UniProtKB/Swiss-Prot annotation:
The gene is CTN. Residues 10-22, 81-95 have a biased composition (Basic and acidic residues). The keyword Nucleus applies. The modification Phosphoserine is found at residue 450. SMART domains: CactinC_cactus. Residues 468-500 have a biased composition (Acidic residues). InterPro entries: Cactin_C, Cactin_central. It holds the Pfam family Cactin_mid. This is Splicing factor Cactin. Keywords: Coiled coil, mRNA processing, mRNA splicing, Nucleus, Phosphoprotein, Spliceosome. Residues 153-201 form a coiled coil. Disruption phenotype: Embryo lethality when homozygous. Belongs to the CACTIN family. It comes from the Eukaryota.
Length: 716
């Protein structure tokens, strides 16, 4: 305000000065004119005064008119200049005012912390974090665009702050929703991955079980072929019905029972076996093994508790895996029921035997009779259940269960015990029916073979011996058949015999042989003994010959894969090495030539080549025109899977090459049944350091020999 007032005072002073000067000028002009006129005309003084006053009045009026004209011009100029000033400066003024408002709002809205951060502690390194930033250029731009000043007030800033915080809350909420959705998605993916892994693991377990199942069948076939039968092999043979002419005549569950064979029958049986061996002239090994397996089955003396537990595990495995047909499932389910029953009875008998041997009282629970089943009623129960088919037993079970549910059964405990016995009788009836069906199929197959051109010849002596002894043993055990087939734990007579045997003498009981037995001629017995020895020697020779004539086990692919894994991936400069560099050695006669058939070992070799950048090559070659490659090392993998003496590792030797001094021969020697093998390699000095790649090991039937050549550096 002071500057504007001072300017106005200066302008008014200048205007007054100009007016005074103009008035003084007019007076001087009038004075000169009067003086001139007085000289010329010389009017009277009064008239001159009047004229002077009128002229002064006229000049004053004209000067006032001139001054008014000049003042009007100055006012119009001032008005136009003030108009120009408002157009230029209003924007600057408004922007400054808006900036002041924004600064005032920022100062008023200043806080101590922003989102938990302060000026002293924040991860951004900003010491003015709590102060609101005023963007002056943006405010000027907004004012130019016509934004009202109310938008820069404290109220507007608070409103914008609320909108920003609302948007921040929305962003936080969306972020939390995305995090929850991401966590849920990751959980679902992890669940899917676990399900996939569980399914893969289940498939692996299933494949592993199938593999073990196949291996168990292979082992069973080997034991059957070699005459080392186990109970599970007999049960599998009952179900499968092998292609040979041998088949089991007894029911499958008879593997659990104890056979009683007299000593005389056993001796007669041994003599008959010897005669069959002589008749076969030790040529038909399959007949001998077949006879031995039949002997093992006919003279089976029952299973121990440990054998039954092992048999139960085998049956359980077959029940889980051998489910190709409903008949197989029924067969193994019935066998598991019979096995559980027999295992429980065997454990019961063992407990009684242990108590009897120790002189202790048997446990009360073992001596107690089954509730509702008196010993005198056992025969009636056996008579009720024996001889019925599986369907009849199922119908009887349904009838008893309906009576128990309706309450019409008079003796509930008795019928419950009968139901318990029904399970084992149903299982045995099912096994009988399946076995009968297998026998019918076998007979049908025999009839077809007899009608065909390729009839299978069976040794008549073998058939006669087996049939006669089976009939004799069956006649002997006919009286004990009911006891053997009955599910009753221990018969009273058997217990009495065992008690008498334990309490009395342990001398063998005198057994009378059959009247048809003949005396043994010493000469004939000696001949038979020599014949048996010849059979054993012939078997050994035949087995050795088959082993030598047989082809090596098909493990070459696996050995090659192992060698490739040991050598690693092929690098630049590696190449397959062997067939062209193999040296044909002179034929040799080894000391083991008469025992084993010599064979050449398989191999899988590599040669490593590369560039040697010495001073000469660096001078005359570059990477675009490289020097010729040179051999830098070898990797030998010689396969000896069938080595007789696996303890003694194969060796290698370096020999001179008569054709060239730049090459030499490396010979590999292992022993029977492999011949020596040699290769022609570059004659250079080797690196024997393991850090430089040297390796010489013999493991898992593979001889690994890896080496590189030394690199000689030029030194002054």
């Amino acid at each position: 305000m002071g500057s504007h007032g001072k300017g106005k005072r200066d302008r008014s002073g200048r205007q007054k000065k100009r007016r005074d000067e103009s008035e003084s000028g007019s007076e001087s002009e009038s004075y000169t004119s009067d003086s001139d006129g007085s000289d010329d005309l010389s009017p009277p003084r009064s008239s001159r005064r009047k004229k002077g006053s009128s002229s002064r009045r006229t000049r004053r009026r004209s000067s006032s008119d001139d001054s008014s004209d000049s003042d009007g011009g100055r006012k119009s100029k001032k008005r136009s200049s003030s108009k120009d000033y408002s157009e230029e400066k209003v924007t600057e003024y408004m922007s400054k005012k808006a900036q002041k408002k924004a600064l005032r709002a920022a100062k008023k809205l200043k806080t101590q912390s922003v989102s938990g951060y302060s000026n002293d502690s924040n991860p951004f390194g900003d010491s003015n974090l709590t102060e609101t930033f005023v963007w002056r250029k943006k405010i000027e731009k907004d004012v130019h665009r016509g934004v009202p000043l109310e938008e820069f007030s404290v109220k507007a800033e608070k409103r914008r702050h609320r909108e920003r915080m609302t948007e921040v809350e929305k962003v936080k909420k969306r972020r939390e929703e995305r995090a929850v959705e991401k966590a849920r998605h990751e959980e679902e993916m992890a669940l899917l991955a676990r399900e996939r892994a569980r399914a893969e693991f289940h498939d692996w377990e299933k494949k592993e079980e199938e593999f073990h199942f196949d291996q168990s069948k292979v082992r069973s076939e080997i034991r059957l072929r070699e005459g080392r039968l186990k109970p599970i092999d007999v049960l599998c043979k009952h179900l499968d019905g092998s292609d040979d002419l041998d088949i089991e005549l007894s029911e499958p569950y008879m593997v659990f029972k104890k056979k009683k064979v007299r000593i005389g029958i056993w001796l007669n049986f041994q003599l008959s076996i010897t005669n069959v061996y002589v008749e076969a002239e030790y040529k038909n090994d399959s007949a001998c093994l077949l006879l031995r397996s039949r002997v093992d089955i006919l003279l089976n003396k029952g299973l121990t508790v440990k054998d039954m537990e092992e048999l139960r595990d085998d049956i359980k495995m077959y029940l889980d895996l051998d489910r190709a047909t409903p008949t197989r499932v029924q067969y193994w389910e019935a066998l598991i029921v019979v096995c559980d029953w027999e295992l429980a009875e065997a454990r019961k008998r063992d407990a009684l035997d242990r108590a009897r041997v120790r002189g202790e009282e048997p446990p009360a629970e073992l001596l107690a009779q089954e509730r509702g089943l008196h010993a005198g009623v056992e025969a009636d129960v056996r008579k009720l259940l024996d001889g019925k088919t599986h369907a009849e037993l199922v119908e009887l079970q349904l009838d008893i269960e309906s009576q128990l549910r309706s309450g019409s059964a008079k003796v509930v405990e008795y019928w419950e015990a009968v139901l318990k016995r029904l399970e084992i009788y149903k299982a045995k009836a099912c096994l009988k029916e399946i076995h009968a069906e297998m026998l019918r199929r076998h007979l049908h197959r025999l009839e077809q073979l007899s009608e065909g051109e390729d009839d299978v010849e069976v040794n008549p002596g073998l058939t006669r011996v087996v049939e006669e002894n089976e009939e004799e043993i069956n006649d002997t055990n006919l009286s004990d058949a009911e006891e053997a087939f009955s599910p009753e734990p221990v018969a009273e007579e058997e217990e009495a015999d065992e008690a008498a045997e334990a309490a009395g003498s342990f001398s063998p009981e005198l057994m009378h042989g059959d009247d048809r037995e003949e005396a043994i001629d010493p000469e004939e017995d000696k001949k038979l003994l020599q014949m048996k020895r010849m059979i054993v020697l012939e078997k050994q020779k035949k087995r050795l010959k088959e082993a030598m004539d047989s082809k090596p086990a098909p493990v070459e692919d696996n050995l090659e894969l192992k060698a490739m894994k040991a050598m690693g991936a092929m690098e630049e400069g590696d190449a397959i090495f062997g067939s062209n560099a193999e040296v044909n050695l002179d034929s040799e006669v080894y000391w083991w030539h008469d025992k084993y058939r010599p064979r050449k070992p398989k191999y899988f070799n590599r040669v490593h080549t590369g560039y040697e950048w010495n001073k000469y090559n660096q001078t005359h070659y570059d990477h675009d025109n490289p020097p010729p490659k040179i051999v830098q090392g070898y990797k030998f993998n010689i396969f000896y899977p069938d080595l007789v003496d696996k303890i003694k590792a194969p060796i290698y030797t370096i020999e001179k090459d008569g054709t060239s001094a730049e090459t030499c021969m490396i010979r590999f020697h292992a022993g029977p049944p492999y011949e020596d093998i040699a290769f022609r390699i570059v004659n250079k000095e080797w690196e024997y350091s393991h850090k430089k790649g040297f390796k010489c090991t013999f493991e898992r039937g593979i001889l690994h020999l890896y080496f590189n050549f030394k690199r000689h550096r030029y030194r002054r």
